């Protein structure tokens, strides 16, 4: 009998307070990069009832209207009325932005060629890929994202007009292990919580989310009579967004990545330009892991990179294929070294990291949009 186990991942919608902050930080990063691709940005956001504060270090030639960028982001998320607990028109916006520290700037060698740009800090970054879905992402996190995205669509197109932007989902899948690879067999449990208008009853909300969100989103063959649904387990959820909880950039790093699979080095992504290896090298590690799986070199793969401030080359490369590769870890590391130049100033070019596309990564995961450069597997020579 094959060994089975349950694994769970969660995701949150655009209106979750922490995700609002991620999106504001990345909207500011995009605004900086739009007119100055060499902008240096480290932008944090905090939010609570009726208030947003952005703070950090930004060095850019772009003229940024922070008020406008922040309010437009909140508006596009859907908080456009105080009845929803937050309103882009009336919220208080505080800005405490300074220039990048000259000590950090001199350590990164901006005066040299871009290829020789030193890493913006020390740190460890991980990338993960698995052959269980075409996207090479764990199905648990993929379905959790898709459920939140479906609620966003239903809220915007009017099919579920009582929905509000703050949503949360969690998906538990029963997996079978096969020589280190994992195969999803069925969905065991689905949890959905959604902020809603006062006008809808909990009973109606539960049946509408089951019929209009869960059933069209989750493949029918994965649902069975044993699947458990916890829809709005708290009952009411009218007070949401920053009114319900304080929000902070960088508090949803597992939602942003692999839903608990693989590993995480601890560095958040949003609000950071490409010189911050927390972001650029984590994208590169994902690119490597996905390329190895796509090339048939492994069915599951975890890659670790590490850097030191001011040093361009990674200090170490580690690969774990969970016993799914015919090659040794040392052979795979050699393949990585031959195929990938992992200096931050080269990653900028190979992954197009000066493009102002970061706001689009700040909700529903950084590895779900298959058009992004790090999601295009590289053809490997080995």
Curated annotation (Swiss-Prot):
Cofactor: Mg(2+); K(+)
UniProt-annotated binding residues for L-methionine: 57, 100, 245, 276
Binding-site residues, ATP: 16, 166-168, 234-237, 245, 251-252, 268, 272, 276
UniProt-recorded Gene Ontology molecular function terms: ATP binding; metal ion binding; methionine adenosyltransferase activity
GO biological process: methionine metabolic process; one-carbon metabolic process; S-adenosylmethionine biosynthetic process
A single Gene Ontology CC term: cytosol
Pathway named in the protein's UniProt entry: Amino-acid biosynthesis; S-adenosyl-L-methionine biosynthesis; S-adenosyl-L-methionine from L-methionine: step 1/1
Protein name, entry field: S-adenosylmethionine synthase
Cofactor binding summary note: Binds 2 magnesium ions per subunit. The magnesium ions interact primarily with the substrate. Binds 1 potassium ion per subunit. The potassium ion interacts primarily with the substrate.
Reactions catalysed, as given in the entry: L-methionine + ATP + H2O = S-adenosyl-L-methionine + phosphate + diphosphate
Pfam families: S-AdoMet_synt_C, S-AdoMet_synt_M, S-AdoMet_synt_N
Annotated EC: 2.5.1.6
Family recorded in the similarity comment: Belongs to the AdoMet synthase family.
Keywords tagged on the record: ATP-binding, Magnesium, Metal-binding, Nucleotide-binding, One-carbon metabolism, Potassium, Transferase
Residues given in the record as K(+) binding sites: 44
Function: Catalyzes the formation of S-adenosylmethionine from methionine and ATP. The reaction comprises two steps that are both catalyzed by the same enzyme: formation of S-adenosylmethionine (AdoMet) and triphosphate, and subsequent hydrolysis of the triphosphate.
Residue positions binding Mg(2+): 10
Top-tier EC class: transferase
């Amino acid at each position: 009998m094959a060994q089975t186990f349950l694994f769970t991942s969660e995701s949150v919608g655009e209106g979750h307070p922490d995700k609002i902050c991620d999106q504001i930080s990345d909207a500011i990063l995009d605004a900086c990069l739009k007119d100055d691709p060499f902008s240096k940005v480290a932008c944090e956001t905090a939010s609570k009832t009726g208030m947003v504060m952005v703070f950090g270090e930004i060095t850019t030639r772009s003229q940024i209207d922070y008020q406008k960028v922040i309010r437009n982001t909140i508006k596009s998320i859907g908080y456009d009325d105080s009845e929803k607990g937050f309103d882009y028109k009336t919220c208080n916006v505080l800005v405490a932005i300074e220039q990048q520290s000259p000590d950090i700037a001199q350590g990164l060698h901006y005066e040299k060629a871009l290829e020789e740009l030193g890493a913006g800090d020390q740190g460890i970054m991980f990338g993960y890929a698995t052959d269980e879905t075409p996207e090479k992402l764990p199905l648990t996190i993929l379905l959790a994202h898709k459920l939140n995205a479906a609620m966003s669509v239903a809220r915007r197109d009017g099919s579920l007009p009582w929905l509000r932007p703050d949503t949360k989902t969690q998906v538990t899948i029963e997996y079978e292990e096969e020589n280190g690879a994992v195969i999803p067999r069925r969905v065991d449990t689905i949890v959905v919580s959604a902020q809603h208008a006062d006008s809808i009853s909990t009973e109606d909300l539960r049946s509408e989310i089951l019929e209009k969100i869960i059933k069209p989103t989750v493949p029918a063959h994965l649902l069975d009579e044993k699947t458990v649904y916890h829809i709005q387990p708290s009952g009411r959820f009218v007070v949401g967004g920053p009114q319900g909880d304080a929000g902070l950039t960088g508090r949803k790093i597992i939602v942003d990545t692999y839903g608990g699979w693989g590993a995480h080095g601890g560095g958040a992504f949003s609000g950071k330009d490409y010189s911050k290896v927390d972001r650029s090298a984590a994208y590169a590690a994902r690119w490597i892991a996905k390329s190895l799986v796509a090339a048939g070199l492994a069915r599951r793969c975890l890659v670790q990179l590490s850097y030191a401030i001011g040093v361009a080359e990674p200090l170490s490369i580690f690969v774990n294929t969970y016993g799914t590769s015919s090659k040794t870890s040392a052979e795979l590391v050699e393949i990585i070294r031959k195929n990938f130049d992992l200096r931050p100033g080269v990653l900028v070019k190979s992954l197009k990291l000066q493009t102002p596309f970061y706001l689009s990564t700040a909700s529903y995961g950084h590895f779900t949009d298959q058009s992004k450069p790090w999601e295009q597997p590289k053809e490997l020579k080995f």
